[in-house]
Amino acid sequence: GNLPFKAIVTLVNQGEFDLASTQVEVGLSGFLAEDFGVTAADKGKLKNQPPDDNPIARKKDSEGNILEAIEVSVPFPSKADGDDFNYARPLPGNRPFLFRAEVCYRYGAQVVSEICVLKNMIDIIDDAPCDPSESKSVFSSASPLGITAFRQNVVGKDKIQFSFDIVHSGSGDVFAIDPNLDNARIHILNALIELNRATPDT
């Protein structure tokens, strides 16, 4: 053909955490690569390509203004390859071609809730400031995996138990970084608990 071109995939980090370009992989599929001048040896260059810059998350400045994330791009073929796509077959008229981008990336989620800790979790006084045996409200950041239905249960005079549901939203798939799932589970949850005692009796 006489119209060489590149396919540009643009990405915007809508999460709360910055990403390095090495933590994002983009692939291009949905079309017959040979028709666009891609040899069998070069097909691998259409997979697992990083963006040209780090996808930085949006920020909030000291005055509370939201600073939106800046788009980063992934060109196909990559800049290092030099060559462009070029449709090699006769094209009698306008014909649409579907290019599909597949993105795999790391992400994190922040979840905040309140728990109830009393001096005596079984013999609760009438004016106790909270109930140690009830479901708690959850405030979760947007991510493909979120925590819902956070629950607290009393299992002893000075013991409590937490349970929660991890829900997958969206149409993507979830992959563990570590192929050993049992070891990967150790890194799923990092909890920070802050205790504020209301009175000496609670």
Residue ranges and their predicted role:
Residues G1-T202:
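Non-catalytic macromolecular-recognition regions in eukaryotic signaling proteins
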